[in-house]
Amino acid sequence: VLSGSDLEPGLYHYSPTEHALDILLPSLDKKEVSSIWMSQRWFRKSSIILIMTAVYRRTTDKYGEKGLPFPFIEAGHIGQNIYLLAQSLGIGCCAIGQFKEKQLCKLLDINPFEEYPIYYIALGN
């Protein structure tokens, strides 16, 4: 969350088992976060950036190699639903393709060999 929300600015993690948001970082350095996405124009107007990550073992342990594309497919489904919801609410929405992987993994405090960011959506006006 960057600005303009009922939530305080910060980095949050969605817990699907508890259907709740946990705060990971209570504040964000907007310059540092901006540099991850190379100060792209859309970033200046974004209020929220959603970041989806994949833990590949969750699908490959169950499905073997066939499970490798499943996180991408599911992220695409989620992304499409976010686009539809944003459209109905009149909120700007843009999927993000260009970013600095190492910096983002460091910000999220994740090991890129176990969990990897796979889909990003900026929301705002």
Task: Spell out what each predicted region is.
Residues 1-125:
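Acidic, surface-exposed loops and disordered segments
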